[in-house]
Amino acid sequence: MKYYWFIFCKTDLLLEKVGNNYTIPLSEEPPIALRPWTHVMNIGPTEDGTEVKAFMIDSPVTDNPNYEMCGLRPSFYLLSTELYLKAGKCHELLYWDQNTKFCGVCGAPMKMHTDISKRCTNCAKEVWPQLATAIIVLVHKGDEVLLVHARNFKSDFFGLVAGFVETGE
């Protein structure tokens, strides 16, 4: 069975070059060697039923001409919408996995309980990925739209007004 392999080094995603296009590696085995301690996460399948796996690597792949590392945001311009959205989900779950290795109650190691939950090996506390509710607002006047440009944007990229919603708002 072939899997899509979403492989991240920090926030950079491994892309496979196919002619003049880019995609996520699709193969039976991971396209790069796994370390013994690498945790491979099972992520929900794509719309066509192809299974998805994701993991983190410590250093970027630079020695293989078939692959290129690309930031998650810039990959929007290189991947299909479905694969880009799946990449975002994979990164979210890998970040959660990296930051929930130990129980917040007793400090014992956490172990995967389901594909998206962990259980403490000592006190049985369960944790799931947290939701960070955010809003995006379209401010318009007639045919004009208010767009914002943050200083940390790397190009002439503009977006709608957005922010996080606090509990009770």
Question: What does each of the following model-derived ranges do?
Answer:
Residues 1-81:
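N-terminal alpha-helical interaction blocks
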Residues 41-46, 118-120, 139:
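Short acidic-hydrophobic surface loop/beta-edge motif
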Residues 42, 54, 102, 136-138, ...:
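Conserved hydrophobic/aromatic beta-strand scaffold that supports enzyme active sites
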Residues 59, 152-153, 165:
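Residue-level signature for short turns and capping positions that connect secondary-structure elements
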Residues 87-135:
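Acidic, metal-coordinating catalytic segment for phosphate/diphosphate chemistry
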Residues 114, 121-160:
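N-terminal strand-loop-strand
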Residues 159-169:
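The catalytic Nudix box helix
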